[in-house]
UniProtKB/Swiss-Prot annotation:
Keyword hit for Transmembrane: no
Domain Response regulatory per the UniProt entry, residue ranges: 155-273
Disulphide linkage map: none
Region of interest: Disordered: 12-31, 43-84, 112-139
A single MF term (Gene Ontology): phosphorelay response regulator activity
Protein name, entry field: Stress response regulator protein 1
Organism in which the protein naturally occurs: Candida albicans (strain SC5314 / ATCC MYA-2876)
Knockout-associated phenotype: Causes defects in hyphal development, reduced resistance to osmotic and oxidative stress, and severe virulence attenuation in the mouse model of disseminated candidiasis.
Function, in words: Required for stress adaptation, morphogenesis and virulence.
One Pfam family it belongs to: Response_reg
InterPro entries documented for this protein: Bact_response_regulator (IPR050595), CheY-like_superfamily (IPR011006), Sig_transdc_resp-reg_receiver (IPR001789)
Gene: SRR1
SUPFAM superfamilies hit by this protein: CheY-like (SSF52172)
Composition skew (Low complexity), residue ranges: 12-30, 45-58, 125-139
Positions bearing 4-aspartylphosphate: D206
Length: 282
């Protein structure tokens, strides 16, 4: 009989009580990470695609619902706005339905469409201008005239006891002859001495002045042949036939009546004619 020590008996019992381990198979040679990686990638991509599709479907559904709500909302409020616009337009246009045209030849026409009120109506003129492609030639009004200043270097003497009249005539002469030289005298007693010291192309005199009036100055000028080439113009309120005849006898060449409501062309041409006529007499 074989004797066993306690240590051997304990080892045998532990071996007999533990289950048998299954046989192990080494797969390291056939299955690894690189062989299963493509499959894992396909599974992950397919899962993300399905999630994205579901999310897009949800967004499309929500967008369609929002568009429908927005459309119904806008349609409702647009109809209200249209009704308000029609009400405002009716309020503005209703008063004009009761207006009747009067004096259409003077009032009812386009300012850009010229027409002759004696030969055609403004309505016909407007219609014809719309249907016609030809340019309309606008005839300028005979009352409109362009006045060009004269650049002659005249020398003028103005004599008037009223300072306002002096300034008015001075301004007019400068408009007519921008290069002219003008001397103004308010004291008529100084005229004789000035005429002996300085020569002028023309002298403008007021008739009614204290001490030495315009008639006195005219007689003094025409008595001296030295001043035969100088024009003399009366600027006065006296315009009766007797006064004009008296002025002519005293040697006054022309008379402008106060106030000076003359066209600039008329005054410039009259002064030019007076000076030229006087100079040609020498």
């Amino acid at each position: 009989m074989i004797s066993m020590n306690p240590i051997m008996i304990r080892n045998n019992l532990s071996r007999s009580s533990s289950p048998a381990a299954p046989p192990t198979t080494n797969h390291s040679s056939t299955v690894d990470y690189f062989s299963i990686k493509p499959k894992l990638s396909l599974d992950i991509n397919s899962q993300s695609d399905s999630n994205s599709t579901q999310s897009n479907n949800n967004e499309d559904t929500h967008s369609e619902q929002s568009d429908y709500n927005s459309y119904t909302h806008n349609q409702y409020y647009d109809s209200d706005d249209d009704e308000d616009d029609f009400d405002i337009r009716d309020q503005l246009l209703d008063p004009f339905d009761k207006i009747t045209l009067s004096n259409c030849n003077e009032e009812y026409y386009s300012p850009l469409t010229p027409f002759d009120g004696q030969t055609t109506s403004p309505q016909d003129s407007i219609i014809s201008s719309k249907s016609s492609n030809k340019s309309t030639t606008v005839v300028p009004s005979p009352q409109f005239q362009l006045t060009l200043p004269k650049l002659t270097t005249y020398s003028f003497l103005i004599v008037d006891d009223n300072i306002i009249n002096l300034k008015i005539l001075n301004r007019i002469l400068l408009k007519l002859f921008p290069k002219c030289h003008i001397v103004q005298i308010q004291d008529s007693k100084l005229v004789k001495d000035l005429l002996h010291k300085q020569s002028f192309d023309s002298i403008f005199i007021d008739i009614e002045m204290p001490d030495v009036n315009g008639i006195d100055i005219a007689q003094f000028v025409r008595q001296d042949t030295k001043f035969d080439n100088m024009g003399m113009v009366a600027v006065t309120t006296r315009n009766s036939t007797q006064d004009l005849e008296l002025f002519k006898q005293c040697g006054i060449d022309f008379t402008f009546h106060k106030p000076l409501n003359y066209s600039l062309d008329f005054m410039a041409n009259s002064i030019d004619d007076i000076i030229i006529t006087r100079k040609n007499k020498i």
